């Protein structure tokens, strides 16, 4: 299973987070974000969360005011992708304490760090929430210590 990209969109259509795992031009990225945003935001809530789009499959889930959107290959399992999205949201919730859109706006670098610990090159790398949270906590501790205070255990 390979993700081509992941988008977090607000209900107003603003992009809050993007991660591209396949090579696309900036023009394509902009067009894809706009097209997919329109498809997802205008879709009635009673319909399913899977869309066929070009040679890909779009899988999305709404949590509060944010849409988590993943583009993957057509042969990938939709339910596993939904579980990965839910896994990411659970980690964000534990880290931020009931994550909201403002958390992602003001702490986008931490959201990207969490995503990078979870998914690498479009593939799920870490399934343990505790491991991801421990690594993020270590990163926070490292960043909070001032210059010259970093300890490296060998």
UniProtKB/Swiss-Prot annotation:
One of its GO terms (molecular function) is clathrin adaptor activity. Pfam families: Clat_adaptor_s. Keywords: Cytoplasmic vesicle, Golgi apparatus, Membrane, Protein transport, Transport. InterPro entries: AP1_sigma, AP_complex_ssu, AP_mu_sigma_su, Longin-like_dom_sf. GO terms for cellular component: AP-1 adaptor complex; intracellular membrane-bounded organelle. The keyword Membrane applies. It is found in: Golgi apparatus, trans-Golgi network; Cytoplasmic vesicle, Clathrin-coated vesicle membrane. GO terms for biological process: protein transport; vesicle-mediated transport. Its main location: Golgi. Adaptor protein complex 1 (AP-1) is a heterotetramer composed of two large adaptins (gamma-type subunit and beta-type subunit), a medium adaptin (mu-type subunit) and a small adaptin (sigma-type subunit). Subunit of clathrin-associated adaptor protein complex 1 that plays a role in protein sorting in the trans-Golgi network (TGN) and endosomes. The AP complexes mediate the recruitment of clathrin to membranes and the recognition of sorting signals within the cytosolic tails of transmembrane cargo molecules. Also involved in early steps of phagocytosis and macropinocytosis. Belongs to the adaptor complexes small subunit family. This is AP-1 complex subunit sigma-2. It comes from Dictyostelium discoideum.
């Amino acid at each position: 299973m390979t993700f081509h990209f992941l988008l977090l969109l607000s209900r107003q259509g603003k992009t809050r987070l993007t991660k591209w795992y396949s090579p696309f031009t900036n023009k394509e990225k902009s067009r894809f974000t706009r097209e997919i945003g329109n498809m997802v935001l205008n879709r009635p809530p009673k319909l399913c969360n899977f869309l066929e789009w070009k040679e890909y499959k779009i899988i999305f889930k709404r949590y509060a005011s944010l849409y988590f959107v993943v583009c993957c290959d057509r042969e990938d399992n939709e339910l596993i992708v939904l579980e990965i999205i839910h896994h990411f949201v659970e980690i964000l919730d534990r880290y931020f304490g009931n994550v909201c859109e403002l958390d992602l706006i003001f702490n986008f670098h931490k959201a990207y760090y969490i995503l990078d610990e979870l998914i690498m090159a479009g593939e799920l790398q870490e399934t343990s929430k505790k491991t991801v949270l421990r690594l993020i906590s270590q990163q926070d501790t490292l960043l909070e210590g001032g210059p010259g205070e970093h300890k490296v255990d060998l």
